[in-house]
């Protein structure tokens, strides 16, 4: 593939500086903590780069960052790049053990905390640094099948290929792009650098979880014109109502399979909207293919064509091209490819292969593990995974990592993790475990201990103890049987079962049953012990808002995570008992 950016500056920071000099007084970023012009963002990131250099950070180093949704975080990202280093975003919600593993694996020389960022607001200009297109811009950790997360090293070239002269999205000075994805999630690469490298404005959403009504109100109030939503969040926004999105020019959605009925509803409600299905793994920098949806869809939504700067091969098991219409595995090529898995040459060599169809020295292709077919017009259709990897709420998960964590427990003999269909149309993780000698591991303790080493999205919604795992005829675990083995039974919980009181308490419990797919929920049952998570919490609070005319923040689930507690919150907010 030919590089698309030609005479453009070779790095993210250099291209940003060009934008800052061309329109210094234009607003660059707005967040709850600050609103900065391009000149101010340039100056503050210079100061932070200088402070990092004074602390011994050198070109090529990795700098860890507690990445909240704040304007100060954007200053830090740019400052790290100006120092010639690569950023490693750390979500504050990550368990301490996972953060420790990631930091140790990355070799980060410095870790910036929220307090550090506030203290580095002033300073002097940094020493100039020459950054090449193939220097590392950031390290993103993904789930690993062996039980350890993998660090993906993404170069500046790959980010520029995504946001400079893109053919799936045009950004300009009149655009306002929302950053809602966590910085550690690769969708933020588009959300942050898309506007800042094209002279647009970046709007950083509040740090807290937002109810759907709060999110759409924010989109309307701050004049968002471009936004990215995961497939699950897109579905919720469509179900809530699209009136607040009438000012949105482009809506990109993906991270999982899009629901055709919701796509069609959005197109009908927002006739001026450009709706794009975006597909791509972290190893190919956010997007590999995009499909602009221009008409109502029947059947599955395609993933489209490769974006500019990207090529694809559809190959069989012997790396031979398959004919149009036949299913093969997707391999990606071009400027978007990551450099490697940090410190993991074995996994790198398995995933990043020499491209046999490109004669240029060093040409590579990335094995995505996704099965696709190509239509006669070049559009690609998605047909699932070739391996066991799954996506839950937009996050890529290797069930093997969870199984390894479970197998490390003394009381677990065997473990298998599968993705089952959830009651809301998405997927949820369910773990099946056996105990030694007929003993029954405590599932509540297992979920709690998994939460200490895995991110919340990788903790199974349910853990079921079985006498034995089912096997196929050749003696392998029958994962298809486990996927089909759904049960609405109430899991083991700390609380004794108490029947909900008639009225709001019973209505809340029923709402939980509907959204969690569990029968017999008690008044004192804990939402998170039942397998609830923030996205389900947002759905429930949205339903309560409609039913009782009150606004309940999703944060309430952390403060009062039971039907009884949530019912009291509804009453206190003005809902009738």
Segments from the language model and where they lie:
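AMP-dependent adenylate-forming
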Residues: 1-2, 9-13, 50, 111-129, ...
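Amphipathic alpha-helical regulatory segments at dimerization interfaces
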Residues: 18, 105, 265, 269, ...
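Phosphopantetheine carrier-protein modules
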Residues: 23-27, 31-35, 53-62, 383-388, ...
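Phosphopantetheine-attachment site and its flanking helix in carrier
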Residues: 46, 70-81, 397-401, 506, ...
């Amino acid at each position: 593939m030919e590089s698309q950016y030609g005479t453009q500056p070779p790095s993210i920071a250099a291209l940003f500086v060009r934008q800052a000099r061309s329109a210094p007084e234009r607003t660059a970023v707005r967040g709850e903590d600050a609103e900065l012009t391009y000149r101010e963002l340039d100056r503050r990131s210079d100061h932070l780069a200088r402070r990092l250099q004074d602390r011994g950070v050198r070109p090529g180093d990795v700098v860890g960052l507690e990445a909240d949704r704040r304007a100060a975080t954007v200053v830090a990202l740019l400052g790290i790049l100006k120092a010639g280093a690569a950023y490693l975003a750390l979500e504050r919600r990550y368990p301490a053990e996972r953060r420790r593993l990631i930091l140790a694996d990355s070799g980060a020389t410095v870790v910036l905390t929220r307090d550090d960022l506030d203290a580095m607001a002033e300073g002097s200009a940094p020493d100039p640094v020459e950054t090449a297109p193939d220097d590392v811009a950031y390290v993103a950790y993904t789930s690993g099948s062996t039980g350890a997360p993998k660090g993906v090293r993404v170069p500046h070239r790959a980010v520029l290929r995504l946001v400079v002269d893109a053919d799936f999205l045009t950004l300009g000075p009149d655009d306002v792009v929302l950053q809602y994805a966590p910085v550690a999630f690769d969708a933020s690469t588009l959300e942050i650098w898309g506007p800042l490298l094209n002279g647009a404005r970046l709007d950083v959403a509040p740090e807290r979880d937002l109810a759907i009504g709060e999110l759409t109100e924010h989109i309307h109030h701050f004049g968002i014109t471009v936004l990215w939503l995961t497939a699950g969040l897109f579905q919720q926004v469509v179900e809530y109502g699209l009136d607040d999105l009438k000012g949105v020019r482009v809506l990109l959605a993906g991270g999982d399979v899009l629901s055709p009925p919701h796509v069609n509803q959005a197109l009908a409600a927002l006739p001026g909207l450009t709706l794009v299905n975006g597909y791509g793994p972290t190893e190919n920098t956010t997007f590999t293919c995009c499909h602009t949806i221009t008409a109502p869809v029947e059947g599955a939504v395609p993933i489209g064509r490769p974006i500019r700067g990207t090529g694809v091969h559809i190959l069989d098991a012997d790396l031979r091209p398959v004919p149009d219409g036949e299913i093969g595995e997707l391999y990606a090529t071009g400027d978007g490819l990551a450099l490697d898995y940090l410190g993991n040459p074995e996994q790198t060599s398995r995933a990043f292969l020499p491209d046999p169809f490109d004669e240029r020295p060093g040409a590579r292709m990335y094995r995505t593990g996704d099965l696709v077919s190509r239509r006669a017009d070049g559009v690609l259709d998605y047909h699932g995974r070739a391996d066991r990897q799954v996506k839950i709420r937009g996050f890529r998960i290797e069930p093997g990592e969870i199984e390894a964590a479970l197998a490390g427990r003394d009381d677990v003999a065997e473990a298998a993790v599968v993705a089952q269909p959830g009651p809301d149309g998405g997927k949820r993780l369910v773990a099946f475990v056996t105990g030694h000698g007929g003993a029954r591991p405590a599932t509540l303790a297992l979920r709690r201990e998994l939460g200490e080493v895995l991110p919340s999205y990788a903790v199974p919604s349910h853990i079921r103890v079985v006498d034995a795992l089912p096997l196929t005829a050749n003696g392998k675990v029958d994962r298809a049987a486990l996927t089909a083995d759904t049960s609405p039974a109430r899991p083991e919980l700390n609380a004794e079962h108490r029947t909900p009181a008639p009225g709001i308490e019973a209505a809340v419990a029923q709402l939980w049953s509907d959204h969690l797919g569990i029968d017999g929920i008690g008044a004192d049952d804990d939402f998170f012990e039942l397998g609830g998570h923030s996205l389900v919490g947002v759905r429930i609070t949205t339903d309560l808002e409609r039913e009782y005319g009150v606004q309940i923040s999703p944060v309430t689930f952390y403060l009062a995570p039971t039907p009884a507690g949530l019912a009291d919150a509804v009453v206190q907010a003005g809902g009738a008992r």
